[in-house]
Amino acid sequence: VEKKQLPHMLCVTNLLLHGIEVPSQIVHDNTLARPLRDYTAADRVNVILTNPPFGGIEEPGIEAGFPADVRTKETADLFLVLIQHLLKPGGRAAVVLPDGFLFGEGVKARIKEQLLQHCNLHTIVRLPGGVFAPYTGIKTNLLFFTKGQPTQHIWYYEHPYPPGVKNYNKTKPIRIEEFDAEKAW
């Protein structure tokens, strides 16, 4: 599901170019517009891997589809509530979130509390600046968690720049080889 027209079109075009004749699984819609209570057991999944949009504000009324204690217009916060809801027991998630989520108060704190109580947040990898340049310079984190058990211990790792690198950008992006320390762990 993709809310914005251009990314939706690019995704469908990419699938067509790679031999998927009818990419019917790619829907142009707002995932957050469906009230949480309307999701059933059939909608639950084992794995969610996502980079939800952050820094965005949802259109009026979207937050009404979420429980009162976690209502917000902040897109990334609503996605984290939805992700927790959609995971089956034992389901796993990897989510890219900004620093603002980790250190925020109010609704963010309540969402984090629910995450820690209902999921085992076992790993946080803090990414260096520029990883998503030129689209955003916001510092980001990778959160890995499994639904069904409360959090006991969190492995926190700050991913360093390699020697000689001061920042990432569009022409010099982060490379997969730079994650060897995380893979070895």
Task: Please name every model-derived segment.
Residues 1-2:
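Conserved acidic E/D residue at the C-terminus of a beta-strand in Rossmann-like folds
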Residues 6-42:
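S-adenosyl-L-methionine
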Residues 36-185:
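A conserved structural/catalytic subdomain of Rossmann-like adenosyl-cofactor enzymes
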